[in-house]
Design a protein with these regions (language model features):
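Amphipathic alpha-helical coiled-coil segments
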Residues: 48, 95, 146, 190-193, ...
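Generic alpha-helical secondary structure signal
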Residues: 35, 39, 124, 130, ...
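Glycine-centered secondary-structure boundary/capping sites
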Residues: 15-22, 117, 205, 209
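Extended amphipathic alpha-helical interaction segments
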Residues: 60-172
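Leu/Val/Ala/Ile-rich N-terminal alpha-helices, chiefly Sec-type signal peptides and the beginnings
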Residues: 1-81, 85
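Compositionally biased, low-structure terminal segments
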Residues: 5, 12, 123, 173-175, ...
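A cross-kingdom marker for long, charged
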Residues: 165-212
Length: 212
C-alpha cells in the first residue's frame, strides 16, 4: 500500500541521520478519509524521525561521541576540564530540549488527530493507535537509554575530575584503587547501555522489514 511504501522511504532515508529526510507525504493514488489519514500519519512520522535525526546531528556537532576519548581528556585535564564541562552542559541542553519537543509534538498530534475531517470511527482508531505507539516507539526506548547514558557520563566525569589519573597504554590509570573501581563499574554500565541501544535498533529494523 501507499502508506507502507512511504513508511519504507522514510525509514530508509532515516538510516543516514546526517542528511535531512526528503519524502513527499502526498500521493495522487490516495483519496477520501484514507488520504487525509495517511498524510497525517506520514507527516507525524516524518517530523518525529527528522527531529530525532536533528538531535543526533546536534550531539555529533558537540563531539559527544568523543566524550571518553582518553587523548581528548588527557589534554583537557591540563585545562581544568573546561572543554568537557562545557560539552556536558551543552549535551544536557540538547537532551532536555529534545525531550520537551517530543512531548509537545505528541500532544499536538493527538489534538490534531481529534479534529481531522474524517469519520469518527477512523478518528478514534487513529488517536488510540497514536497513544499506544507513543510508549512502544523505538525512538522513545532509545532516548530513555540515552538519558541513562548521560547520567552515567556525569558520574564517570566526576570520578575523573576528582581523582588523580594518567594515560598509560591507552587506558585510564588511577593512583588509588577506589576511584579505579568506581570508574570501571561505571564504564561497564555505559557499555551495557550502548549494547542495549544497539539491540533496540536491530530489533526495530527487523520489525519494520517484516511489516514492509
Amino acid at each position: 500500500t501507499v502508506l507502507y511504501e512511504k513508511t519504507e522511504q522514510i525509514y530508509k532515508q532515516a538510516q543516514d541521520w546526517t542528511t535531512p529526510i526528503r519524502v513527499d507525504v502526498k500521493d495522487p493514488r490516495l483519496t477520501g478519509d484514507y488520504q487525509i489519514m495517511a498524510e497525517f500519519v506520514l507527516s507525524h512520522m516524518l517530523q518525529n524521525t527528522e527531529a530525532r535525526n536533528q538531535y543526533l546531528r546536534d550531539l555529533k556537532a558537540l563531539n559527544w561521541d568523543q566524550f571518553l576519548n582518553i587523548d581528548r581528556l588527557s589534554k583537557d585535564k591540563k585545562n581544568n576540564y573546561a572543554e568537557t564541562e562545557q560539552m556536558l552542559k551543552n549535551v544536557h541542553a540538547v537532551v532536555e530540549s529534545y525531550a520537551q519537543q517530543v512531548e509537545q509534538r505528541q500532544k499536538e498530534a493527538i489534538a490534531q488527530a481529534k479534529d481531522l475531517a474524517i469519520s469518527s470511527r477512523f478518528r478514534h482508531q487513529l488517536t488510540d493507535s497514536m497513544k499506544a505507539s507513543e510508549k512502544s516507539h523505538e525512538a522513545t526506548r532509545l532516548f530513555s537509554l540515552e538519558q541513562q547514558n548521560l547520567a552515567k557520563a556525569d558520574q564517570i566525569f566526576l570520578v575523573l575530575k576528582n581523582n588523580q589519573w594518567e594515560k598509560k597504554n591507552n587506558t585510564f590509570m588511577f593512583y588509588e584503587d577506589a576511584p579505579l573501581q568506581q570508574f570501571n563499574a561505571l564504564y561497564k554500565e555505559i557499555l551495557a547501555l550502548n549494547s542495549q541501544m544497539q539491540q533496540v535498533e536491530k530489533q526495530t529494523q527487523k520489525e519494520v522489514e517484516q511489516k514492509l
